[in-house]
Each structure stands twice: as C-alpha cells, then as structure tokens.
C-alpha cells in the first residue's frame, strides 16, 4: 500500500513533464486538423485553386516528417515551440498562397522537431523507466485534445467571411504555442527535473562496480 502510494505521488510530481511534452503533440495535431478543417475557408478567402489546396496539405505533412528527422537543430536556435508560433502567426497574416505556404512549412518543421525531442526529454528527466513509460503514454492524450480543439474552433468560426475563420484558428494555435514556450522556458520545475536527472546520470557510472547499474543502461 505504501509503495503504491509513493509511486502515485512520484508520478503526480512529474506530471508537468507529460503536460509540457503533450502540448507539442497537441500543437502537431492542431495544425494538421486546423488546416484540413479550414481549407475551404482558405480556398475561398485567398482564391486558391485545387492544385494549391493539395500542395498546402501535402507540403505540411512533408514538413512535419522532415522536421522530425532534421529540424531539431534549426528550431533549437530560437526554440521549437516559438518557431511554431512564428509559423502560425505568418499564416494568420498571409495575404496569398505563397506566404501561407511559408508559414505552414515553418510551423510543420517545428512541430515535427518538437515531438521526438519532447519524448526524449520526458524519458531523460523521469526518475525511473516505469515513470517515464507512464508519462510518455499520458502525452498521447494530448494528440486527441489538439484534434478536438481544432475542430471546435473551426466550427465556431465557420460563419466568418473570407479567410477570417482560418486566421482565427491559426491565431489560437499561435497563442497556445507562445504560452507553452514561456512555460517551458520560465518554469523552475522543469529546470529542477533536468538538473536532478543530470545528477543521476553522472552518478550511475560510479556505482557500476557495486553491480547496481550497468553502463549499457546509461
């Protein structure tokens, strides 16, 4: 009973890690669903043809995939979530297809870069493998949250004229991204978790001789 209680408390203490990483998943699904749910609005508001509509969806998907492989270093220069916010903000003010496409590419790269890095940070900063596994599984809920929020926002703005509805949806995504960036940047909790994990990592090789930790697990 005591072990179970301590485990629950430990998981609860580290839940901010899951929330911070989950926001990355939420923003990723949010931009995919946000675009698909408002693509007709963008098409009518900006006068896009069917080829341009197809390019927007296809290139966004490619940008997310490319970002997950190569976008980490690029986005880390200014912060992955802030990079996402910049891309979403460009979409908000896009006057034509080209600018909208640029915004989607930037946001897609940042979204793709954030997902694997966030999972790695959760695994690194969690106190043990069991807690890390639970935290990572918890972040998956946020993907569905992003889908839900985007659909609701798209429905609420569907009656707006021109591309205004699409701009509002992307503005909401940009605001979420800025809030997430500030939270990750300024919260002392995440700094404390990361420093504690670094201390644990530094201590592990020292106890290998006692048979407590294997170097292969470091």
Regions found by a protein language model. Give the residues of each.
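Transmembrane-helix signature of 12-pass secondary carriers
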Residues: 1-218
């Amino acid at each position: 009973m005591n072990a179970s209680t301590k485990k629950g408390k430990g998981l609860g203490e580290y839940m901010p890690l899951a929330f911070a990483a989950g926001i990355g998943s939420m923003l990723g699904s949010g931009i995919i669903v946000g675009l698909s749910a408002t693509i007709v609005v963008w098409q009518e508001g900006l006068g896009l043809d069917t080829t341009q509509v197809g390019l927007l969806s296809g290139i966004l998907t490619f940008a997310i995939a490319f970002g997950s492989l190569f976008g980490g270093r690029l986005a880390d220069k200014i912060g992955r979530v802030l990079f996402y916010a910049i891309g979403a903000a460009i979409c908000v003010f896009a006057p034509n297809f080209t600018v909208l496409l640029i915004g989607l590419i930037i946001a897609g790269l940042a979204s793709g870069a954030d997902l694997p890095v966030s999972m790695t940070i959760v695994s690194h900063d969690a106190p043990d493998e069991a807690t890390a596994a639970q935290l990572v599984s918890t972040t998956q809920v946020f993907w569905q949250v992003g889908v839900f929020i985007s659909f609701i926002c798209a429905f609420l703005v569907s009656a707006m004229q021109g591309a205004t509805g699409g701009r509002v949806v992307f503005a909401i995504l940009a605001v979420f991204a800025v809030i997430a960036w500030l939270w990750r940047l300024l919260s002392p909790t995440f700094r404390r978790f990361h420093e504690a994990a670094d201390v644990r990592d530094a201590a592990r090789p020292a106890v290998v001789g006692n048979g407590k930790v294997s170097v292969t697990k470091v």
